[in-house]
């Protein structure tokens, strides 16, 4: 059977626990939203096949736990990322204030070759809560923060209502492509999982 070659782009979603990282990922990939909150343990990822400018590529979206005790997992998961998405809850000042910590954490752990130009995207989520009346972080304040960090693209979303989720991820995909650190993924029509129990090196010298 013939095989296909695709470009693999790795995207990392970071932010405090409970800001809606998993919901954003599920809304984009599966067009689904669940009101039942379940904290991500460690990290999880979903993939979506996307076509852009006559190119077929696979977007691999990593959803990492927001709890500090899991930040030590960062090196393995952050390395090789093509774009980093910083998410906060517009109804939580703390989650917004922590964006800088998450950005710095990523740059330290991922150690990109060109940190000044590495693509970030910021998402202010949960704009649907209480009809927007409970928000405590203004769009103006968020955009000012993004401008100060090198004009980071900014989106306000509702994972629950699907507002601006598609638009945000379109920009994420485009920025990931521009990063230039693309990996070619060889995808055969059948996948041999017979040796899946054998450990694989992450390249980390521990």
From Swiss-Prot:
GO terms for molecular function: GTP binding; GTPase activity. It comes from the Eukaryota. InterPro entries: P-loop_NTPase, Small_GTP-bd, Small_GTPase. This is Ras-related protein Rab7. It is a lipid-anchor. Belongs to the small GTPase superfamily. Rab family. One of its GO terms (biological process) is protein transport. The keyword Electron transport does not apply. The keyword Amino-acid biosynthesis does not apply. It is found in: Cell membrane. Transmembrane segments: none annotated. CDD domains: Rab7. Protein transport. Probably involved in vesicular traffic.
């Amino acid at each position: 059977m013939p095989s296909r070659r695709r470009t693999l782009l790795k995207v990392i979603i970071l932010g405090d626990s409970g800001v809606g990282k998993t919901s954003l990922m599920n809304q984009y990939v599966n067009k689904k939203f669940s009101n039942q909150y379940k904290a991500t343990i460690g990290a999880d990822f979903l993939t979506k096949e996307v076509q852009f400018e006559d190119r077929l590529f696979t977007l691999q979206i990593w959803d990492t736990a927001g709890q500090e005790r899991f930040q030590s997992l960062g090196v393995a998961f952050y390395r090789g990322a093509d774009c980093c998405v910083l998410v906060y809850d517009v109804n939580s000042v703390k989650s917004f204030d922590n964006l800088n910590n998450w950005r710095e954490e990523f740059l330290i752990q991922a150690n990109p070759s060109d940190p000044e130009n590495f693509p970030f995207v910021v998402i202010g989520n949960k704009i649907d809560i209480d009809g927007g009346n409970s928000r405590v972080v203004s769009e103006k304040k968020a955009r000012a923060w993004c401008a100060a960090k090198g004009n980071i693209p900014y989106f306000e979303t509702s994972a629950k209502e699907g507002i601006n989720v598609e638009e945000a991820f379109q920009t994420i995909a485009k920025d990931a492509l521009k990063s230039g650190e693309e990996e070619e993924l060889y995808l055969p029509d059948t996948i041999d999982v017979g040796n899946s129990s054998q450990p694989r090196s992450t390249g980390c010298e521990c």
